[in-house]
UniProtKB/Swiss-Prot annotation:
Keywords attached to this entry: Endonuclease, Hydrolase, Nuclease, RNA-binding, tRNA processing
One GO CC annotation: ribonuclease P complex
Reactions catalysed: Endonucleolytic cleavage of RNA, removing 5'-extranucleotides from tRNA precursor
Main function: RNaseP catalyzes the removal of the 5'-leader sequence from pre-tRNA to produce the mature 5'-terminus. It can also cleave other RNA substrates such as 4.5S RNA. The protein component plays an auxiliary but essential role in vivo by binding to the 5'-leader sequence and broadening the substrate specificity of the ribozyme.
GO MF entry, a single one: 3'-tRNA processing endoribonuclease activity
Species of origin: Pseudomonas paraeruginosa (strain DSM 24068 / PA7)
Protein name: Ribonuclease P protein component
Subunit structure: Consists of a catalytic RNA component (M1 or rnpB) and a protein subunit.
Gene encoding the protein: rnpA
Length: 135
């Protein structure tokens, strides 16, 4: 079982890490007042980055509340999100939504991201790979 913490290794920290997601996202999920960009990271855990600017969410109290709620939602869903670098971008109006509505919206975003995840074939399922029997 994956721990449900939000340590430093579960965060996108550098401009290079953010740029990698912005430049070539493999998953893009628009939501109400939010955009979620994701990219495969090749790790056994997901990483999260948040972009919540003053221009879109005016009050610091609202920005901090949003960050707290997004991190909490991510923490509870990180087992399913393993292998993704995810950037969540806040748009105008996100700060005005109530907490229950935000929880519901973030849950839907994670599910939509997982639904859009490209299927990866295991080597045994790939065409042309021998299954151990020789003809």
């Amino acid at each position: 079982m994956v721990s449900r913490d939000f340590d430093r290794d579960k965060r996108l920290l550098t401009a290079r890490q953010f740029s990698a997601v912005f430049d070539s996202p493999t998953g893009k999920v628009p939501g109400k007042h939010v955009l979620l960009l994701a990219r495969e990271n090749g790790l056994d855990h997901p990483r999260l980055g948040l972009v919540i600017g003053k221009k879109n969410v005016k009050l610091a109290v609202q920005r901090n509340r949003l960050k707290r709620l997004i991190r909490e939602s991510f923490r509870h869903n990180q087992e399913a999100l393993a292998g993704w670098d995810i950037v969540m971008i806040a748009r105008k109006g996100l700060g005005e939504l109530e907490n229950p509505e935000l929880h519901q919206q973030f849950g839907k975003l994670w599910k939509r991201l997982l639904r859009n995840r490209p299927r990866t074939e295991s080597p045994a399922d790939a065409p042309g790979v021998a299954d151990g029997t020789h003809a």
